[in-house]
Amino acid sequence: MTWTFTSDLTAYLAAAGPAVAAQPVSNTTLLTVADALERRGIAAYGSDAPFFGWWTGADGTVAGGLLCTPPFPLLLSAVPEEAVRELGAALATEPLLAGLHGINARRADAEALADAWGRPTRYAEEIRLYRLAGLLPPDPAPAGGARLAAEADLPLLVEWIDAFNAEADVPGSASEAVLRDRISYGGILLWEHEGAPVSLASFNRPIGSAARVGPVYTPPALRGRGYAAGVTHAVSEAAYASGASEVLLFTDLANPTSNGVYLRLGYTPVEDRAEVVPA
């Protein structure tokens, strides 16, 4: 039983790709990040080199993986308990794991790794993964309607994504190339009221059977009017129409309002994850 670490994306995909893809719901973020690195290049998330790893069990079968695109946290897939223990030990010995900015894993795994890290840690974020069990219309229906974002909307999209990132403490700024890509497949919707955009929602290209909604953003002055529910309903329909059989999203557990909105739209909890960072 062992972890193998590498900076070679091709080697990671060959070794860990099938195991990670076998659980497309739980491993949604690892799948979308690896897809972006394949399509947009190894520097898709910044100039620091990403690294990867996979867990091989006692029977010689690969049973999970990890990846990290600094300065973002290490992402750990669903893995057996013994893999978490061994990864905790590797935090002190594996050069590629030195200088981690954080670890994002299923809640119990994040707790175990925080204990094993050998340094003070704190929880930077606690999130819940939801899957859409059956789409329900927002009640009451918000005023206005949805439309696809277009190239002419880019300045607004950049402004709103940057505002979302600042609120969510996400590193980096909006990428026009990424936004253009999402526009190209109908992956960004705007909710309009009286001819003006009031809310935004997006989804990634379906990978395997799953697409993930996010981000969803409404400017602070326009919140509390149901616009986020309206645009999330519309983008969920669009994700299904794009070919996904599973539509997913993450929420911040510290935000009961958004969690309530998604539950009322028909999303159901799958699992909780946490991001631990050096204190």
Regions found by a protein language model. Give the residues of each.
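Conserved donor-binding loop and adjoining core beta-sheet/short helix segment
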Residues: 3-9, 24, 31-94, 198-211
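Conserved GNAT acetyl-CoA-binding A-motif
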Residues: 97-106, 209, 239-251
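Conserved beta-strand-loop-alpha-helix junction that forms the acyl-donor binding cleft
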Residues: 104-110, 249-259, 276-279
